[in-house]
């Protein structure tokens, strides 16, 4: 909740000047929606960036499904959204520590030796 940055699409990211604008728009967030383009996540390590990307992409899919249904919907109150976001932030074991080992084990089963 209010932890995602936004950046307007500027065409192909060939201009080095866009790097500074991306950095400024990220503004300390770890997740960004690149309008009309895609998603961007950063983290202390690959596990954190991947976990954030997985959650953000899933959230976008849910929103698209809800909007595509054409049915009325309601959002939870702002204070409840903030409370839930803070609970997730304060969770004793970060997602990257819960999910990453299992994801690596699954990848090793599907593609043995991928990490060599």
Regions found by a protein language model. Give the residues of each.
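Glycine-rich flexible loops
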Residues: 1-116
């Amino acid at each position: 909740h209010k932890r995602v940055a936004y950046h307007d699409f500027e065409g192909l990211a060939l201009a080095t000047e866009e790097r500074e604008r991306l950095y400024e728009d990220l503004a300390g967030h770890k997740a960004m929606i690149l309008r009309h383009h895609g998603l961007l996540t950063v983290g202390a390590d690959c596990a954190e960036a991947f976990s954030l990307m997985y959650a953000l992409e899933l959230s976008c899919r849910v929103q698209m499904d809800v909007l595509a249904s054409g049915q009325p919907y309601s959002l939870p109150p702002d204070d409840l959204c903030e409370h839930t976001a803070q609970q997730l932030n304060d969770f004793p074991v970060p997602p990257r520590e819960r999910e990453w080992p299992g994801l690596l084990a699954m990848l090793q089963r599907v593609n043995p030796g991928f990490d060599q």
